[in-house]
């Protein structure tokens, strides 16, 4: 529930005392929920970007996050089924701090460490994407437009866009937006969505993509998540890294399920 309003790093703080005890499936569910939603702090920015092409953009984006939260749980449980006993709430462990001042200083130190780790991981993942694009550009034959990693991912995701209810004629452009969202981030994808011509994308397709793009499932967010969980629960750093790429896929599938639902409602005349 917290993921709908705050970020993927802040929301696990609500259950920090239980992070080390979560089963593998529960941990993956927490990761997927972070990938399938966006923080309330950026909703206003995205609504401003889409305001001219999507009537009531703010309401659609908030609804997208609300619907994608249960969708994330569904997809996560299907991809990593529960095999252990569910983690109960129980009693919180006693606080390790003996005074308010000790808690304040330790919290400040942990916060700074978390911030620096996030910055470092984000730089590394963005740099890796840039490096791949440089290599692909050098391998591009003839006078063709330079190949990019996000472009290739977009081609792969075109059938997924079609499964969301987007017409096949528009699936290539929609897949390109999904690819940009996964490789780079959803903000750049929303900018392209707002700039797309009416000939390229119909109003219904724009509405579906508004929901399908509304999530943090991208490589930069993976770096942020690895840094965040690595600081909050160091004992499970390797497990989080193993589940990282799978959580991006799960988050993308969750938002696409939301987009498909909106597409069905639009076809039935219930929305749009």
Report residues per predicted region:
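Loop-to-transmembrane-helix entry motif
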Residues: 25, 107, 111-122, 243-251
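Juxtamembrane inter-helical linkers in multi-pass membrane proteins
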Residues: 1-14, 84-103, 149-153, 177, ...
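Transmembrane helical segments that form the transport core of multi-pass membrane transport proteins
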Residues: 109-198
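Alpha-helical membrane-protein architecture signal
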Residues: 97, 101-105, 153, 171, ...
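Long, contiguous bundles of hydrophobic transmembrane helices that form the permeation core
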Residues: 66-112
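Alpha-helical transmembrane segments
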Residues: 57-75, 207-215
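Hydrophobic core segments of alpha-helical transmembrane domains in multi-pass membrane transport
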Residues: 36-48, 64-80, 121-134, 157-160, ...
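Alpha-helical membrane segments and immediately flanking helix-loop junctions
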Residues: 1-50, 174-261
């Amino acid at each position: 529930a917290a993921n709908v309003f705050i970020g993927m790093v802040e929301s696990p703080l609500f259950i920090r005392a239980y992070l080390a005890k979560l089963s593998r499936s529960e941990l993956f569910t927490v990761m997927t929920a972070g990938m399938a939603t966006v923080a309330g702090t950026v909703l206003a920015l995205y609504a401003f970007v889409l305001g001219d092409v999507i009537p009531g953009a703010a309401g659609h984006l908030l609804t997208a996050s609300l619907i994608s939260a249960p969708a994330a749980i569904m997809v996560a449980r299907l991809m990593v089924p529960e095999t252990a006993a569910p983690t109960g709430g129980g009693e919180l462990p006693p606080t390790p701090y003996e005074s308010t001042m000790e808690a304040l200083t330790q919290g400040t130190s942990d916060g700074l460490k978390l911030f620096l780790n996030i910055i470092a991981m984000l730089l590394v993942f963005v740099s890796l994407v840039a490096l791949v694009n440089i290599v692909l550009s050098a391998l591009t034959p003839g006078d063709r437009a330079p190949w990019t990693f996000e472009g290739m991912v977009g081609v792969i995701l075109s059938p997924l866009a079609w499964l969301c209810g987007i017409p096949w004629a528009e699936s290539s452009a929609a897949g390109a937006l999904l690819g940009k969202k996964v490789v780079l981030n959803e903000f750049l994808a929303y900018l392209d969505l707002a700039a797309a011509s009416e000939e390229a994308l119909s109003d219904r397709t724009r509405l579906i993509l508004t929901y399908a793009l509304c999530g943090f499932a991208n490589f930069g967010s993976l770096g942020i998540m690895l840094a965040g969980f690595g600081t909050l629960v160091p004992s499970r750093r390797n497990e989080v890294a193993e589940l990282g790429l799978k959580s991006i896929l799960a988050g993308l599938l969750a938002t696409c399920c939301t987009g498909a639902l909106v597409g069905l409602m639009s076809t039935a005349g219930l929305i749009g």
